[in-house]
From Swiss-Prot:
Organism expressing this protein natively: Oryctolagus cuniculus (Rabbit)
Protein name (record): Urokinase-type plasminogen activator
Family listed: Belongs to the peptidase S1 family.
Listed SUPFAM superfamilies: Kringle-like (SSF57440), Trypsin-like serine proteases (SSF50494)
Domain Peptidase S1 intervals: 181-426
InterPro entries noted in UniProt: EGF-like_dom, Kringle, Kringle-like, Kringle_CS, Kringle_sf, Peptidase_S1_PA, Peptidase_S1_PA_chymotrypsin, Peptidase_S1A
Post-translational modification: Phosphorylation of Ser-325 abolishes proadhesive ability but does not interfere with receptor binding. Produced as an inactive single-chain protein (pro-uPA or sc-uPA), is processed into the active disulfide-linked two-chain form of PLAU/uPA by a proteolytic event mediated, at least, by TMPRSS4.
Glycosylation sites: 324
Known function: Specifically cleaves the zymogen plasminogen to form the active enzyme plasmin.
Subunit details: Found in high and low molecular mass forms. Each consists of two chains, A and B. The high molecular mass form contains a long chain A which is cleaved to yield a short chain A. Forms heterodimer with SERPINA5. Binds LRP1B; binding is followed by internalization and degradation. Interacts with MRC2. Interacts with PLAUR. In complex with SERPINE1, interacts with PLAUR/uPAR. Interacts with SORL1 and LRP1, either alone or in complex with SERPINE1; these interactions are abolished in the presence of LRPAP1/RAP. The ternary complex composed of PLAUR-PLAU-PAI1 also interacts with SORLA.
Coiled-coil segments on the chain, per record: none
Annotated gene: PLAU
Length: 433
């Protein structure tokens, strides 16, 4: 009963506060509240140990940290404190203090949460200086980092998308990631919508499959230099996006010519290993367009600098590669399997690859040695979940045989080549950083 009376008295004081300011007293030491943006620290008349911020008209929040009139961001949006709270596909953001978000790197309970704009709300923020404000969005069973529907102040008001029109959202796919596949399985392109199938024209009109690749921006595909080193004529290559079958059309696929073919100037091949094995292809359709987003066509996120997943992490590989090195033909249907990242210390053991493996490479294998990338998978993606986003961690490069014990697949470590990628693509809009 005593507790109830105290609660009723406190409620009465709050009500009286809403009706007049005479029940509140200013506090000389505003640090008790941490008020921002000109907010003043006040206390209740009969409860001097309870403080709160009295905010100016355009601000709200526990510390007056939310700018209710802010509708755009400057720079990368690190200082944005507005109220946008959906991603670019209009899905609601998760609150920074929600249970699932509290397990992430950025959440409302961090010691520096106030400085980063995080709190008991679901408004878009950019605490880690990504390209623009973002938030966590519930997609299936996962909480993914998604860019927000808020425009850059310097570019003017962004027009609303027509109903049904999609935008590129790197690392997002229509089907849920499946990191528990054993032995590999045939799949459809919606499972890996960033996968690019690269073909070569021959004299006489025949066309053969060459390698895989990954769409990292609407106009650019990343692959492996060794796929093109012996034939560098860009006009002879064709790139398909949205394709599930090797030699027949998939509804919704797009076909592209190669406008630029950029091979890494430091590429070299040893007896077994390929060094600096990365290439870029600028793609353009016959009507002058780059890729258009759909359920079967999407960009893959590039990794943070030197922030690769931990060894032992399960990742996906995809391609039209052979199931065994002795097979004569490539499979007709796109195939996907799951491998685990292998540590450098293990991969550099003499019975693995020794000194052939460098820090610009990653090793990955099936723990049972039953499935692996193989001939024809070269240039394709090794995709892992990094900070909640599907990310291009590696590019299929080399290995001894296919699924041989103690001989994992070796992949170009994409995080080590971000400066090289940026030097050729620059700050082009749409790069999946």
């Amino acid at each position: 009963m005593r507790v109830l009376l105290v609660c009723l008295l406190l409620c009465a004081l709050v009500v009286s506060d809403s009706e007049g300011s005479h029940e509140l007293h200013g506090v000389s030491d505003a640090s008790n509240c941490g008020c921002l943006n000109g907010g003043t620290c006040v206390t209740y008349k009969y409860f001097s140990n309870i403080w709160r911020c009295n905010c100016p008209k355009k601000f709200q929040g526990e510390h007056c940290e939310i700018d209710t009139l802010k509708t755009c961001y400057h720079g990368d949006g690190h200082s944005y404190r507005g109220k946008a709270n959906t991603d670019i596909m209009d899905r609601p953001c998760l609150a920074w203090n929600s249970a699932n978000v509290l397990t992430k790197t950025y959440h409302a309970h961090r010691p520096d949460a106030l400085q980063l704009g995080l709190g008991k709300h679901n408004y878009c923020r950019n605490p880690d200086h990504q390209r623009r404000p973002w938030c966590y969005v519930q997609v299936g069973l996962k909480q993914l980092i998604q860019e927000c529907k808020v425009h850059d102040c310097s570019s003017g008001k962004k027009p609303a998308l027509p109903p049904g029109k999609l935008e590129f959202q790197c690392g997002q796919k229509a089907l849920r990631p499946r990191f528990k596949i054993i032995g590999g399985e045939f799949t459809i392109i919606e499972n890996q919508p960033w996968f690019a199938a690269i073909y070569r024209r021959h004299r006489g009109g025949s066309v053969t499959y060459v390698c895989g690749g990954s769409l990292i921006s609407p106009c650019w595909v990343v692959s492996a230099t060794h796929c093109f080193i012996n034939h560098q004529k860009k006009e002879d290559y064709i790139v398909y996006l949205g394709r599930s079958r090797l030699n027949s059309m998939t509804p919704g696929e797009m076909k592209f010519e190669v406008e630029q073919l950029i091979l890494h100037e430091g590429y070299r091949a040893d007896t077994l290993a390929h060094h600096n094995d990365i290439a870029l292809l600028k793609i353009l359709s016959n009507n002058g367009q780059c890729a258009q987003p759909s359920r079967s066509i999407q960009t893959i996120c590039l990794p943070p600098w030197n922030a690769d997943p931990n060894f032992g992490t399960s990742c996906e590989i995809t391609g039209f590669g052979k199931e065994n090195s002795t097979d004569y033909l490539y499979p007709e249907q796109l195939k996907m399997t799951v491998v685990k990242l292998v540590s450098y210390q293990e991969c550099q053991q003499p019975h693995y690859y020794g000194s052939e493996v460098t820090t610009k490479m990653l090793c990955a294998a099936d723990p049972q040695w039953e499935t692996d990338s193989c001939q024809g998978d070269s240039g394709g993606p090794l995709v892992c979940s990094v900070q909640g986003r599907m990310t291009l961690t590696g590019i299929v490069s080399w290995g001894r045989g296919c699924a041989l014990k103690n001989k994992p697949g070796v992949y170009t470590r994409v995080s080590r080549f971000l400066p090289w990628i940026r030097s050729h693509i620059g700050e082009e809009n749409g790069l999946a950083l």
